[in-house]
A protein has these predicted regions:
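Juxtamembrane and boundary regions of transmembrane helices in multi-pass small-molecule transporters
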Residues: 2-3, 164-167, 171-227, 232, ...
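Core transmembrane alpha-helical segments of multi-pass membrane transporters/permeases
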Residues: 38-46, 50-55, 64-98, 113, ...
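Juxtamembrane helix-boundary/capping and inter-helix hinge elements in multi-pass membrane proteins
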Residues: 57-61, 73-75, 152-156, 181-194, ...
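Hydrophobic alpha-helical transmembrane segments of multi-pass integral membrane proteins
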Residues: 80-91, 111-143, 318-358, 362-363, ...
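Membrane-interfacial loop-to-helix junctions in multi-pass transporters
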Residues: 74-80, 104-122, 148-158, 202, ...
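Hydrophobic mid-bilayer segments of alpha-helices in multi-pass membrane transport proteins
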Residues: 7-21, 35-57, 78-86, 117, ...
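Alpha-helical transmembrane segments of multi-pass membrane proteins
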Residues: 83, 113-126, 152-169, 326-339, ...
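Interfacial loop-to-helix junctions that mark the boundaries of transmembrane helices
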Residues: 2-4, 27-42, 70-75, 106-111, ...
């Protein structure tokens, strides 16, 4: 990493002004419907990368291209892109009718008022088992939208419920990339981090579920939704959900869904053999923008890191926060800032690990608590950025199924990260220091 240089963070500011600033201006000041869609996120990132390339003229353009390429050479980035594409193929194969059958079947078994609460709980379990919030959101978004259409609940509320549940599970799962990154970086056992994490995350999940139930009971929905459904078309989603709960690798789960979905759609005559591959292709194509965002973010962050932008951020946080509680809050803001900058909580944790470990040693904070705080605050940050992988994959899946939903609509219905922030702040400032080193 080069000498600390706060100016290197300018591309992030440029992106935020273009995407968030103009989006808010168009939608809420100029009252343009779906104003955020007038700001293509890829163009905003391209402008930000252009600004990054114009900085630091002591580095040649060819060298900058090499740096951006090195930023893409990361397992997490490749895994994320492949999940996007394979998940898109799954959505393309099973189509909207299969998701609707799942939703109608669920709503036939439970009162319509509890539909959103059930979505949240299911997402919690699936994400904990699968270890990926992105995979969980991809699998459950079509179901959430079908539940919305069948029950009358707003689509952003249903998507917000599954996103919150997915973040809860990803935050706790033993096989989550964020858990692995945090525990390896801080040198603690996963079971110890889980126990520390669970007592913070559980109250937030309970509060989220309670709020969803309150909103549900305030609605005028009564009884059950009685719509026809095809049990055979439910099979791909059942297999995928069972695979997720069993903790099977997300790629294996999605491939099972694609194979079973293809067979069922062909056998029932829902899809012609000549259309099957085309449907897969259109489904994956619906994820192209999401995959491109992941690529552009990785490239931009590689330049910022080389210029010393992240080093300056780390140094500033380390210098400002003093004392044990201040150290814990500083760790949280550190990884939160990294997450906002990179839009990838695993990358943010990896980047924050070295300075967080140093702060933990200085302030007497145990490795398990440090790992837990890094994972929790990165989760909170993912809930407040409209360009995170979780949000993008939800929007892409919704768009693929014909729904026009803005990130801000979902963010106002994404309750879990807010409750998690309150829970962790209470834990930091009101919990007495009793742990042993």
């Amino acid at each position: 990493m080069k000498k600390n240089n706060p100016i290197a963070l300018l591309p992030i500011g440029v992106f935020l002004v273009l995407y968030l600033g103009l989006g808010i201006l168009f939608e809420y000041v100029m009252k343009i419907p779906m104003g955020f869609y007038n700001i293509p996120i890829i163009i905003a990132f391209l402008v930000a990368i252009l600004v990054a390339c114009l900085q630091n003229r002591s580095v040649s353009f060819d060298k900058k291209l090499e740096l951006m390429a090195s930023g893409l050479a990361d397992k997490n980035i490749i895994t994320m892109i492949l999940i996007f594409l394979v998940a898109g193929a799954f959505v393309g194969v099973v189509g909207r009718s299969s998701a609707e059958s799942v939703a109608f079947f669920m709503l036939a078994l439970i009162p319509a008022r509890f539909a959103v609460a059930v979505l949240f709980v299911v997402a919690c379990f699936v994400s904990t088992a699968m270890g990926t919030s992105v995979g969980t959101i991809t699998l459950l978004t079509p179901i959430a939208l079908a539940v919305s259409a069948a029950s009358g609940f707003d689509a952003p509320l249903c998507i917000g419920a599954i996103m919150g549940g997915a973040m809860f599970g990803d935050n706790l799962s033993f096989i989550s990339d964020t858990t692995i990154a945090a525990c390896n970086g801080q040198g603690c056992a996963m079971k110890d981090k889980f126990r520390e994490n669970f007592k913070i995350a559980l109250p937030a999940a309970i509060a989220t579920l309670a709020l969803i139930l309150v909103l549900s009971f305030r609605s005028d929905l009564n009884g059950a939704v009685n719509e026809s459904y095809n049990l055979i078309q439910i099979i791909p989603y059942v297999l995928v959900l069972i695979g997720g709960i069993m903790g099977i690798n997300v790629f294996v789960v999605l491939l099972i869904g694609i194979v079973s979905g293809s067979f069922i759609m062909l056998a029932t005559g829902q899809t012609a053999p000549t259309d099957l591959l085309a449907n897969m292709g259109s489904g994956s194509a619906g994820m192209f923008e999401t995959a491109m965002v992941a690529i552009l973010v990785a490239a931009m962050c590689a330049l910022i890191r080389e210029y010393g932008g992240f080093g300056a951020l780390l140094h500033a946080i380390h210098r400002v926060f003093k004392g044990r509680r201040g150290g814990q809050l500083g760790m949280g803001l550190l990884v939160g800032a990294m997450d906002i900058a990179t839009a990838n909580n695993t990358v943010a944790i990896v980047m924050a690990n070295p300075i967080a470990k140093e702060m933990a040693s200085e302030y007497g904070i145990t490795p398990r608590k440090t790992a837990s705080l890094l994972d929790i605050f990165s989760c909170v940050s993912q809930g407040v950025i409209p360009y995170g992988a979780q949000m993008l994959v939800a929007l892409s899946a919704a768009a693929e199924l014909g729904y026009e939903i803005s990130a801000l609509n979902i963010m106002t219905n994404l309750f879990y990260p807010g409750f998690l922030l309150v829970s962790v702040l209470i834990f930091i400032f009101l919990t007495p220091h009793r742990e042993k080193r």
